[in-house]
Amino acid sequence: MKLVSALIASLAILTVPLGALAQGYPTKSITLVVPFAAGGPTDIVARTLAANMSRTLGQTVVVENKAGAGGTLAGGYVAKAAPDGYTFLIHHNGMSTAPALYRKMAFNPMTDFEYVSQAVDVPMTLIGRKDLPAKNMQELTAYVKANAKKINLANAGLGAVSHLCGMLLQQAWGVDLTTVPFSGTAPALNALLGGQVDILCDQTTQTTSHIKAGTVNLYGVTTKQRIRALPDAPTLTEGGLKDFEVIVWHGIYAPKGTPAANIEKFGSAVRTALKDQAFVTRMADLGAEIVPDSKQTPEGLRTWLQAEIGKWGPVIRSAGVYAD
């Protein structure tokens, strides 16, 4: 009799629509995994987002930092997590560059995740040491081409977005510069400020204060249009580099097989945060911009990720750069 009752109960559950099963979601705290150390740009975005989403969802969204291996450690962790809607990943461009940078990976960005949404874009800036003779982009291009063997191009480390930006710059200029990798943006900036290196491409979250203080030369921003944080800064395309665009974008992912209804509810909380004025203002203060509505969807993120993999793969492979 007990067996029959159990079977009847099981069949009853199977007849309940999937959406109904997710109506009570979430019933406990949710983990948002960040692939980098606390205090960095992605971590700041994640924590600001998590605080807003916690209010919307009625459960705490806990940020967990799992730094290492250029973000692939966190990616592998989330890919193998239970697909129940209680573990998510927020990652930047590293999701699109890892397939080319790493010959061995524990996950496939295009097949091992469900896509939730993009969130915010952080523009990059091209800056130079204050005493560099070139004062605008046209002058810098001429100076670089005439002094290619003397120019030191700093970056925040192998595979960092600043490294990728530097590779794209060299391709656009048609030169090979001496690249100097550092263990993060802070030491790279310090070297630039101290005159040990000549130019650096890095995020507005790190460079804006120095630009406004006048301690570096600003040559332009790496976006298609000018940005609100630095409205007088020309784009690099305006400066002569055709169709030049590099942004630090952030996408949110879930383990493959996570219920669609849970992804929709979590994604809805993301979209609510992206429209919250306090969140928008905080991001603007960091130089970050909210992505358009078309990117705030699973398909928008999937399409963007696929395009970025196609964009960066050839750049990285042509440079012969590997992180493992």
Go through the PLM ranges and name each one.
Residues M1-I8:
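Bacterial N-terminal signal peptides that target proteins for export
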